[in-house]
Regions:
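Hydrophobic/aromatic side-chain positions at a characteristic register within alpha-helices
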Residues: 19, 57, 99-102, 106, ...
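Residue-level detector of extended alpha-helical repeat arrays and alpha-solenoid scaffolds
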Residues: 124, 423, 448-452, 483, ...
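Conserved hydrophobic register position within alpha-solenoid helical repeats
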Residues: 164, 339, 426, 448-451, ...
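Alpha-solenoid repeat junctions
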Residues: 347, 434, 459-463, 490, ...
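Amphipathic alpha-helical scaffolding segments comprising HEAT/armadillo-like alpha-solenoid repeats
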Residues: 407, 423-442, 464-474, 495-507, ...
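Short inter-helical turns and helix N-cap capping residues of alpha-solenoid HEAT/ARM repeat scaffolds
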Residues: 448, 478-479, 509-510, 541-542, ...
């Protein structure tokens, strides 16, 4: 964007000169252009936001002035503005002051004032979160209770209702009301399971994933391991299906640790066995060996615990036999012999004890093979914790697609986002505030479509998940240019949720929207995009859309994508086959090449010729 703008120093000089002669509008416009240089030096950019704050204050645009001050301003520069803005902007500002306040008592007061302002603005969830941050759990609980009743009575959003109930359970525990907490946990689990089922049914696995993550949190808060286990089993399933193997393996490790901590050793051993099989399938032998050794250790612990509590001896015996298998698969033969010795010492019938004794004798001189056994390496781990969706997603629900609010969250979080991202968010918020002012003055239906298009273009530069909700909200407008701009913007958002709106766009009554959506598909080429792309390919009646899906799939280097593309070449129409061949010629991944070479002899004439064409173009000998 910056290369099409006038030089920064010229724009700043123009703004200063205009402001000096009393032309605040000209100064504002020049500074607006200058701020488009979002990769400028930080000291220059901070100075410009300060200048813009002064100009907008002169023009009476206090919300815009406060927004500019949010970027790098101080409490001193913001205090004169907060009395002139709506409660939500006051609340956000007070929250930011509280977050950086060193004095604990003043910090609590600021959080309380922020909560009061949120309540005044009718924003119950955000008020409750502010109460929690100020350690006022009793009043937070009352707010969560009010929100939970509201959502449950409407019956429209199981997910939001489940989150509200979970927050009610959390705050009930912190205020000592365990009975209310149990009741809220029960309701929350029921609602979240219902929501997850619905999301999976309509193909929104990423939303179901959030439900299962909350189930894990519920189990940890309440001490109910069954919720932890249900959550992890489904989280791992979705991560595996989305080919996010490192995330899946890390989740396996977390699940095993959680099961051990709860004393559910048998469940931990079973999870370790599954982890070992998955790691081996994914070509990670060290992780597989680590999981196998963990499994063997845990089965021995299961056996010891069973015998200590007086359970039938067969339970301990079966657990030790599982340990034998695990050690054997890992090549730890001396340890196999040690486990057989333990089996021969169990209080079993004499024939079985002798059998295990003979087995032990076969391993007297056996040695353990040297193996590499290590957990998932640190550089492959995702150390950023799972977001508190029980707060984050309720805030999104409450914001109802507001671009100004979503962008404001980004500006006010310098610890989370880069300078460039926050600058772009500031520009998007200023655009959104201008649009809101026009809507308030003339009505939304009388605001020119170009204003909404400009907002979509500004939002597209932010490229964060939190911006998807405002874009989804914009897509519901009637003006075709707005929907086209939204779809074009979505091509920059590499998230599975992006496909929800794109699938709507692909069935839009306007051909221009469909065309832009098909182009956007080709940009969404990340591993876990396979499932939605495959679904679009199967469901679409448009050859052009199917071809776009094929081109996107050709850039995803996974076995599943390669297998599907080979199926397209073998069984589907000539247009789809041609699109697949041309796309695969330009692709860089090797999964399709490996699969095609191995199965070339089994292909029929046209399909074999097409695959040979791809292999020759990629300079692969056949």
């Amino acid at each position: 964007m910056s290369q099409h703008l006038r030089p920064l120093h010229e724009l700043r000089d123009e703004a200063r000169a205009a402001f000096a002669r009393g032309d605040a509008v000209r100064a504002r416009d020049a500074l607006w252009s200058a701020l488009q240089h979002t990769i400028a030096r930080e000291e220059d950019y901070v100075a410009m936001t300060g200048e813009l704050r002064e100009v907008l204050t002169r023009l009476g645009d206090h919300r815009g002035a406060l927004t500019a001050s949010w970027y790098a301003g101080t409490e001193q520069s913001q205090r004169p503005l907060v009395t002139h803005v709506p409660p939500i902007d006051r609340a956000r500002t007070l929250l930011a002051w509280a977050d950086r306040e060193p004095d604990a008592e003043r910090q609590k007061r600021l959080y309380g004032r922020a909560a009061d302002e949120y309540e005044a603005g009718g924003l119950v969830a955000q008020a409750a979160i502010a109460r929690e941050r100020g350690q006022d759990f009793a009043r937070a609980r009352a707010l969560w209770s009010r929100l939970a009743q509201l959502l449950s009575s409407s019956g429209a959003d199981f997910y939001a209702a489940g989150l509200a109930r979970f927050n009610l359970a959390r705050t009930s525990l912190r205020t000592g009301d365990t009975a209310a907490a149990r009741e809220a946990v029960f309701a929350s689990v029921h609602l979240l399971e219902e929501a997850a089922d619905r999301y999976e049914t309509i193909g929104q696995r990423e939303r179901a994933f959030d439900c299962y993550q909350v189930l894990i949190a519920i189990g940890r808060e309440s001490g109910a391991f069954e919720h932890v286990l249900e959550g992890y089993v489904n989280v791992i399933r979705i991560l595996r299906e989305d080919h996010l193997r490192y995330y899946a393996l890390q989740s396996y490790e977390e699940a095993v640790a959680a099961a051990e901590k709860q004393g559910e050793i048998s469940a931990a051993a079973t999870l370790s066995r599954e982890m070992a099989a998955y790691a081996r399938k994914e070509g990670l032998p060290a992780v597989a060996n680590f999981a196998m050794m963990t499994q063997a250790r845990l089965w021995q612990e299961v056996s010891g615990a069973a015998l200590r509590r007086g359970a039938p001896t067969e339970i301990g015996e079966n657990a030790l036999l599982a340990a034998v298998i695990a050690y054997g698969e890992a090549g730890q033969y001396r340890r196999v012999g040690d486990v057989y010795r333990g089996l021969s010492e169990l209080p079993l019938e004499e024939a079985r004890k002798k059998h295990y004794g003979r087995a032990r004798a076969r391993y007297v001189d056996a040695q353990d093979l040297p193996i590499d056994a290590a957990p998932l390496p640190a550089h492959l781990r995702h150390e950023v914790g799972f977001p508190e969706v029980w707060h984050v997603d309720l805030v999104e629900w409450e914001q109802s697609g507001s671009a100004s609010q979503a962008a404001g969250d980004v500006i006010l979080d310098p610890s989370q986002w880069s300078e460039v991202t926050r600058r772009r968010a500031m520009l998007a918020r200023l655009t959104a505030l201008s649009l809101e002012a026009q809507e308030a003055a003339a009505g939304a239906e009388r605001v020119p479509a170009g204003v909404f298009v400009a907002l979509a273009e500004q939002l597209s530069t932010v490229e964060l998940y939190t911006i998807l909700s405002p874009l989804e909200h914009l897509f519901r407008r009637q003006e075709v240019p707005v929907r086209v701009a939204v779809v074009r913007a979505l091509s920059r958002f590499l998230y599975k949720r992006t496909f929800i709106t794109l699938r709507e766009a692909l069935t839009d009554p306007e051909p221009t929207v469909i065309h832009e959506a098909a182009k956007a598909l080709e940009e969404l080429r990340f591993p876990h995009a396979f499932d939605p792309l495959a679904r679009i390919y199967r469901e679409s009646q448009s050859a052009a859309v199917r071809a776009s899906a094929v081109r996107a799939l050709s850039k995803i280097d996974t076995f599943e994508a390669a297998e599907m593309l080979l199926g397209v070449i073998r069984h589907d129409g000539s247009e789809e086959r041609a699109a697949a061949v041309e796309a695969l010629k330009r692709a860089r991944g090797m999964k399709f090449i490996d699969l095609a070479r191995g199965g070339l002899a089994e292909l029929s004439g046209p399909a074999q010729a097409a695959v040979r064409d791809v292999l020759q173009a990629r300079a692969v000998s056949v």
